[in-house]
Amino acid sequence: MWCIVLFSLLAWVYAEPTMYGEILSPNYPQAYPSEVEKSWDIEVPEGYGIHLYFTHLDIELSENCAYDSVQIISGDTEEGRLCGQRSSNNPHSPIVEEFQVPYNKLQVIFKSDFSNEERFTGFAAYYVATDINECTDFVDVPCSHFCNNFIGGYFCSCPPEYFLHDDMKNCGVNCSGDVFTALIGEIASPNYPKPYPENSRCEYQIRLEKGFQVVVTLRREDFDVEAADSAGNCLDSLVFVAGDRQFGPYCGHGFPGPLNIETKSNALDIIFQTDLTGQKKGWKLRYHGDPMPCPKEDTPNSVWEPAKAKYVFRDVVQITCLDGFEVVEGRVGATSFYSTCQSNGKWSNSKLKCQPVDCGIPESIENGKVEDPESTLFGSVIRYTCEEPYYYMENGGGGEYHCAGNGSWVNEVLGPELPKCVPVCGVPREPFEEKQRIIGGSDADIKNFPWQVFFDNPWAGGALINEYWVLTAAHVVEGNREPTMYVGSTSVQTSRLAKSKMLTPEHVFIHPGWKLLEVPEGRTNFDNDIALVRLKDPVKMGPTVSPICLPGTSSDYNLMDGDLGLISGWGRTEKRDRAVRLKAARLPVAPLRKCKEVKVEKPTADAEAYVFTPNMICAGGEKGMDSCKGDSGGAFAVQDPNDKTKFYAAGLVSWGPQCGTYGLYTRVKNYVDWIMKTMQENSTPRED
């Protein structure tokens, strides 16, 4: 039994809508019971309406049918509520009440309260499916353009050039899909200047060659689109989309946006969307492709060539750094680079910048220093100084350098050439003073004669004239081209010499006018008795070691009789063949004949055989002070006539007829040209 009931229910649930039917109140035609509520759901096939009519109506009457009633509902709308008794007004029709609804569903609900004072028989009603005109029977028009009715339904259609949307009700214009690739063109809304279609979405695409941007131009009078609502929202709208940039939406009478739109893109989508209403003429625009502009970037510290007010796609500029600036990436030392305006509106090589030239850490110099710079960039200033008081800056310029635009440290006088610190010559740290009479001279300190060089073999002297050269007599080195030499020591004791500076000779240069003899001991001609020793390593100057000056070539350096000069050395004294401590004496210049008149001590030849020339200076003769054997090669130091703080080597101890009288000295002034030439030609180490 339950299976039969379930089957019946399922059959009712899934029953097809019927074209007609009957509805009777409970127990009809007998009196309906109290406290009853029953409903009937009526459904006819889609496309039909329902005609519901009553042939009998006998329900307890009450105000607003509050007690008993039959209610007719269509959707959420109550079509009617009935009670009381009704009779037909048409003798030819049994219908006492009827309802016509354009929908295919209807609900009928019957209610009775708890008591009835009289006997009421209820109602008898019938329904039939009726054809409806969807095109006219509804408040809302089902079709946007043409509505076509048929029995059981309707269909929509569109005028030419329109199409029916997927909802089968609304018509639209097929206005999408157009792609514009020409560099210039015109686009308008459908039917322009006639009213554009409603309920449409038109999409236009502009696709230009990369490197060109789309520029849209409109006139205000060419734009008439349905205005915005009260909230400011466009009902119909025109929108421009270029990449991630959007212009619009625009609507209203007269174009409200900029009349010239630069999109910065070669691709532009134009979207025109309309709603269901509106009768406006639409819009018309023009577009053209403008070469993509590149910004005129203000690259600091540079000049752009060529200079233009505007740069566009494919333009090439040369960016040249200002003086003192360079490109920090790319080629080393580059001062300019090229940049091209690219299709994306950006410059190539945009990462390259002009930054201050860096001159780097300045080079160090011998015998001097440079202060640590706060900066090494263009415009920075450094200063070189020499190790005073033993060195001075020979080539001028003041030692101040600035970081120049070419990346070099430059001096106003020397340019990029580094300053040269050379030894200060002829200035003893402690001037010589004759403190105590010694036979033939006085004790001296090496600080009185810092140029004094001691030759160990043979026992002799020399004069330091710069950091690489020693001046001495030719006869000192003619027999030993690799002499052992020392500087910086007052005493020549072995223990003291070990603490002094030993000089290593590289090459000996004897004046070409010096005559070499097989037996030097019998020499009677000491003309051109001068030689130079090139040292292997430079001598570091200090309080006990510094050179003596060379004489100038002007007449100021011509010695006069009576001019005083200083001699120093470790030569023979009255008591000893060799001195251990440095001795010195002050001697006057004497006429050359004074030396000629002195009888030669232990002559090896006739007195007339000894040669006296203008290349020799005669000095001494007073109080027994004179140079002697062992002093050879030492300087005869005379105060500089143009700078009283300095001494120059006026002569070199050469020979003498007799110790303690007059001595002969090589006149150095006559050999300055040879000295300078020899040193210049041999300024670099010799390759023997």
From Swiss-Prot:
It is found in: Secreted; Cell surface. Changing E63A: Does not affect association with the C1Q subcomplex. It holds the Pfam family CUB. Gene3D superfamilies: Complement Module, domain 1, Laminin, Spermadhesin, CUB domain, Trypsin-like serine proteases. GO terms for molecular function: calcium ion binding; identical protein binding; serine-type endopeptidase activity. Cleaved and activated by C1R. Immunoglobulin-binding promotes autoactivation of C1R, which results in the cleavage of the Arg-Ile bond in the catalytic domain. Inhibited by C1 inhibitor (SERPING1). This is Complement C1s subcomponent.
